[in-house]
Amino acid sequence: MKVSLPAFEKAKVLVVGDVMLDRYWVGPTGRISPEAPVPVVKINQVEDRPGGAANVALNIATLGGQVQLAGLVGEDDTAKALTLGVQALGVEPQWLNIADKPTITKLRVLSRNQQLIRLDFEESFDKQDSARLLKQSEALLDSVDVVVLSDYAKGAIDNPRDFIALARSKGVKVLVDPKGSDFSRYHGASLITPNMSEFEAVVGAVTSEADLLEKARGLLNKYQFDAILVTRSEKGMTLVTANAPELHIPTVAREVYDVTGAGDTVISALATSLAAGAELAQACAIANTAAGVVVGKLGTSTVSRIELIEALALHHGESGFGVVSEDQLAYALEQAKLRGERVVMTNGCFDILHAGHVSYLKQAKALGDRLIVAVNDDASVKRLKGEGRPVNQVDRRMAVLAGLASVDWVVPFSEDTPQRIIARLLPDLLVKGGDYKVEDIAGGAEVISAGGQVQVLGFEDGISTTAIIQNIMAKQ
């Protein structure tokens, strides 16, 4: 299945649920305590990250979605730290402060990228607190397309059935990250996303794939869910709906360092994708890819749009790693520049990739951190090179280029010159191979006007696509 990202900036999502602060104490350990057989950790780093429903909201914001966040907190310094954490990414929280309860905090002690212990500071909120939170959140339903209920069984989501019914009556999809063995509380939800242990806590042990599907469909019928997405760790995800065949999506994680917050990432990517107009199967594939990225990070983390673009290109793209649309590339460049990366760009037909091309692209990449290759599409090559060209279709040309270690992104263009796309992307450095003069290079004036540079690189003598084609024809 070809997977592309929808316009996340159009997504409007409300997250309601158990917010918490994930606090990390980090340091080296080199000895055992004389008081007890436990390691001594010398703390040299303290970090606070929004967790639970707050992490869901931050994931949505990081992807580019518009998000509102509602949750229960205490009247303490932890609540202030949590507020600052979400505001840092542009999320304005709608807290309900409960004076006699602490803001939920999970403190983790880490050494050498390993979690040694977790300490929880919490008291469950009362039912009336949850009722007030859900009532307060009703006023926000008219301004969103999707609601996420992030339930960690801490009291914020006690009995949301009326809230779900109201949201659905307004045409708002309701996604639930469930907790506990009573799924009747989520009756009528659009989609629930239990992991395998949460699923089995409700339906009992799953003995086979057929058994999983039968039990999932039983829940659909019993609680009037539109769909169930069971996340299955190394086995990927299984989507079950009432009126379509099941969909199994294999895992895409390459390395797993920490599963903290992986469920948050799944439901946030689902919500953002659906709110942006994606079909359910597409949204699930995006969420699966996002989860594969986040488990490769340590601690509660988010996934950026550029990370998702690259991971999708690697795992789902039909043209190989690095092949992106112009819009995807424009966003990727914004992120690259925010990270302080120097972006180099070149262009060409690259009809038959040869040693001269490879050497040239390697030189170009050495001049910066990222290399973009803009490729003439088939119609453009035919106009420039004549009948019989291109030898290779644009998808194949881009796939070969994307396989080179020196190339980060490959993007097609349809005009005879790349002036328009260069003027839009404005790399830090525009390079061209051959005997061009800088003032004659398409797009060069625009790059220089924007403060960038233009440079001419040499090609290896005696190697060209035309010469290769002529040599092949002479031997026939």
UniProtKB/Swiss-Prot annotation:
Pathway listed: Nucleotide-sugar biosynthesis; ADP-L-glycero-beta-D-manno-heptose biosynthesis; ADP-L-glycero-beta-D-manno-heptose from D-glycero-beta-D-manno-heptose 7-phosphate: step 1/4; Nucleotide-sugar biosynthesis; ADP-L-glycero-beta-D-manno-heptose biosynthesis; ADP-L-glycero-beta-D-manno-heptose from D-glycero-beta-D-manno-heptose 7-phosphate: step 3/4
Active-site residues per Swiss-Prot or TrEMBL entry: 264
The organism of origin for this protein: Shewanella oneidensis (strain ATCC 700550 / JCM 31522 / CIP 106686 / LMG 19005 / NCIMB 14063 / MR-1)
Record-linked PROSITE patterns: PFKB_KINASES_1, PFKB_KINASES_2
One MF annotation (Gene Ontology) recorded for this entry: phosphotransferase activity, alcohol group as acceptor
Pfam families from the UniProt entry: CTP_transf_like (PF01467), PfkB (PF00294)
Ribokinase, as annotated region: 1-319
KW Kinase (keyword) present: yes
Reactions mediated catalytically: D-glycero-beta-D-manno-heptose 7-phosphate + ATP = D-glycero-beta-D-manno-heptose 1,7-bisphosphate + ADP + H(+); D-glycero-beta-D-manno-heptose 1-phosphate + ATP + H(+) = ADP-D-glycero-beta-D-manno-heptose + diphosphate
GO cellular component labels: cytosol
Protein name: Bifunctional protein HldE
NCBIfam families: cyt_tran_rel, PRK11316.1, rfaE_dom_I, rfaE_dom_II
GO BP annotations listed: ADP-L-glycero-beta-D-manno-heptose biosynthetic process
Family in the record: In the N-terminal section; belongs to the carbohydrate kinase PfkB family. In the C-terminal section; belongs to the cytidylyltransferase family.
Keyword Nucleotidyltransferase attributed: yes
Function description: Catalyzes the ADP transfer from ATP to D-glycero-beta-D-manno-heptose 1-phosphate, yielding ADP-D-glycero-beta-D-manno-heptose.
Keywords: ATP-binding, Carbohydrate metabolism, Kinase, Multifunctional enzyme, Nucleotide-binding, Nucleotidyltransferase, Transferase
